[in-house]
A protein has these predicted regions:
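An intracellular "coupling" helix at the cytosolic face of ABC transporter transmembrane type-1 domains
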Residues: 10-14, 79, 100-104, 120-133, ...
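Hydrophobic alpha-helical transmembrane bundles that constitute the permease/transmembrane domains
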Residues: 20, 24-32, 66-73, 125-128, ...
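ABC-type nucleotide-binding domain
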Residues: 329-582
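Conserved catalytic Walker-motif region of ABC-type ATPase nucleotide-binding domains
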Residues: 98, 220, 308, 338-340
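Transmembrane helix-loop-helix hairpins at lipid-water interfaces of multipass membrane proteins
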Residues: 13-74, 78, 151-156, 267-271
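A short amphipathic helical element positioned immediately N-terminal to and/or at the very start
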Residues: 1-13, 114
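Helix-loop-helix
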Residues: 45, 50-54, 63, 149-163, ...
Length: 582
């Protein structure tokens, strides 16, 4: 799994090579220090070497220490650069992949999980890479070199550590074996907590309006407790590593002291050599400990890597078909056709149809309205036109060509859309409007704002078009937000303009002005509007009435008043509501 991610370190390969190279040199330098110290004790202090030998060996130790320090710092810097580069590349490629996801893909992963994968999971992989680029080279070099020196110095005494190492490795393997599933569960609980927090922050106004803070606290406590329990389950296994390793280390040191003291007493080993032996034993045991730490980090990193690779290798449900490349496309006129369309949200094909047997033609330049009760599939219907979802059965055609045969960018460039949830981004009013068309002139910007009845309130803002909007446009009203979104869509001069309940927050007079602007300025544009108020759609060229999953009726307002019980019921209920409110 980690091998799959290693290709994403491109651009930072030199640092990824430098880090282990320099850490290997550092380990070799540290290998000679105990030997020099043993010489100082045995030859300089207890022997005939005197101060001359001590100075010579001391300068050698100083030179090796400086070289070791330089190599260690270089390795640390290189590993940091390489790991940060890997993290940057992973985040960039994941974010780019997410931009290609369809709505169904987003629903499948969930936005909270994608955020966790893009941040927490990548950070874990990044930290593990930084540590392992150093430890996984240092540990084997140090372990093997120190063991070889120990064998040369005293093979019998080395047996103490040779017996302990397999026991340590077995215990480490048993602990690590049970950790991967626990870390995977831990990451999933982070997803759950993030989802709870995200929902709360997005809906904080609703929470306060309905006095649901205590309910939200209880929901957060549940997610938080589940994360704590998952974390504890993983940590309880992990904390076994330290006492197990320390026990093995102290047992080894006691064994070396016991047997080594006997060797010194019998003259088979010099005091300085015993000191050096102790140093090498510590190096060997610390190497095994480093391997344990790396394995622990790798266990969690593998769990995170699986989640990251799952995103990177996901094939978007909706993508350009091979046939769409280089295809001659029809002239952009704005004709929309639904032919025998069935649709269900379940990717497996199970579940009930949200839309069934939809046959509908919208001619170029027509003003078509879609009405119906809540949950009848109105938004789903229009979401099929820009191919946010693919039909389960049948065809959706734009200008006579199946939407699946268009390059996605070309299809969506023909469509301007104001979604049911009005989204504005942090930045200026101008920057938000230019999402519609980045190369629009100032005059076009002003005209689009006027057409959407947004110009007056924009100019009343402190900096006009250069007034900054907070994230999500929270510093403008719901009606102002809707009008800015309409202006953004109109600035695009689309062949097809789709408005999904986009005037629900504006008053009737303003809505009438927007409708008049459509008739004057969008004569050649096909307008499809979803609305709850009959007053918003009664002048449409065609009104489509959805009921459950199918088209119950279609026609003009006058025709439907004569032929459709559902439409007549909607109209009469709104008239009665208007009288009651009056």
């Amino acid at each position: 799994m980690l091998k799959k991610l290693s290709v994403h370190i491109r651009g930072f390969e030199k640092d990824a090579i430098k880090a282990p190279l320099f850490i290997g040199i550092e380990a070799v330098c540290e290998l000679f220090l105990p030997l020099l110290m043993a010489g100082i004790i045995d030859d300089g202090i207890n022997g005939d070497g005197g101060m001359a030998y001590i100075w010579k060996a001391g300068l050698g130790m100083l030179a090796l220490s400086v070289l070791s320090l330089y190599c260690g710092m270089t390795a640390a810097k290189s590993s940091a650069v390489a790991s940060q580069g890997l993290g940057r590349n992973l985040r960039s490629e994941m974010f780019s992949k997410i931009q290609d996801f369809s709505f169904a893909d987003i629903d499948r992963f969930s936005s909270a999980s994608l955020i966790t994968r893009l941040t927490n999971d990548v950070n874990t992989i990044q930290l593990t890479t930084m540590m392992c680029l150093r430890m996984l080279v240092r540990a084997p070099v140090q372990l093997i070199s120190a063991l070889v020196v120990c064998l040369v110095m005293n093979a019998r005494l080395t047996l103490v550590i040779v017996v302990v190492i397999p026991v340590m490795c077995l215990l480490l393997w048993l602990i690590m074996r049970s950790c991967e599933k626990l870390f995977t569960r831990f990451q999933e609980k982070i997803d759950g907590l993030n989802n709870t927090v995200q929902e709360n922050l997005i809906g904080i106004r609703v929470v306060k309006a309905f006095v649901r803070a205590n309910h939200e606290r209880a929901k957060f406590k549940k997610s938080n407790d589940e994360l704590r329990d998952a974390g504890l389950a993983a940590v309880m296994r992990v904390i076994l590593i330290s006492p197990v390793m320390m026990l093995a280390m102290y047992a080894s040191i006691l064994g070396v002291m016991w047997f080594g003291g006997g060797f010194v007493a019998r003259g088979e080993l010099l005091p300085g050599e015993l000191y050096a032996f102790f140093s090498y034993i510590v190096q060997v045991l610390m190497s095994v400990l480093m391997v344990g730490v790396c394995l622990l980090m790798l266990t969690r990193a593998v769990a995170c890597a699986k989640r990251v690779v799952e995103v990177l290798e996901a094939e978007p449900d909706i993508a350009d078909s091979p046939e769409s490349r280089g295809r001659a496309l029809p002239e952009s006129r704005g004709k929309v056709e639904f032919r025998g369309v069935n649709f269900k949200y379940s990717a497996s094909g199970s579940g009930d149809d949200v839309l069934h047997g939809i046959d509908l033609t919208v001619e170029p330049g027509q003003f078509v309205a879609v009405v119906g009760g809540t949950g009848t599939g109105k938004s789903t219907l229009v979401n099929l036109i820009p191919r946010f979802y693919d039909v389960t059965q049948g065809q959706v055609l734009v200008d006579g060509l199946d939407v699946r045969d268009y390059p996605l960018a070309e299809l969506r460039s023909r469509i301007g859309m104001v979604l049911q949830t009005n989204v504005l981004f942090s930045g200026t009013v101008r920057e938000n409007l230019l999402w519609g068309r980045a190369d629009a002139t100032e005059a076009e910007l002003v005209q689009a704002a006027k057409n959407a009845q947004a110009y007056d309130f924009i100019m009343a803002m402190p900096q006009g078009f250069d007034t900054r909007l907070d994230q999500g446009g929270v510093n403008v009203s719901g009606g102002q937000k809707q009008r800015l979104c309409i202006a953004r869509a109109m600035l695009r001069h689309p062949a097809i303009l789709i408005l999904d309940d986009s005037t629900s927050a504006v008053d009737s007079a303003t809505e009438a002005e927007i409708r008049r602007s459509f008739s004057e300025n969008l004569k050649d544009t096909t307008v499809i509007i979803i609305a709850q108020r009959i007053s918003s759609v009664r002048y449409a060229d065609k009104i489509v009435v959805l009921d459950d999953d199918h088209i119950a009726a279609e026609g003009t307002h006058e025709e439907l008043m004569q032929t459709s019980d559902i439409y007549r019921e909607i109209y009469q209920s709104q008239q009665e509501g208007a009288i009651d409110n009056g």
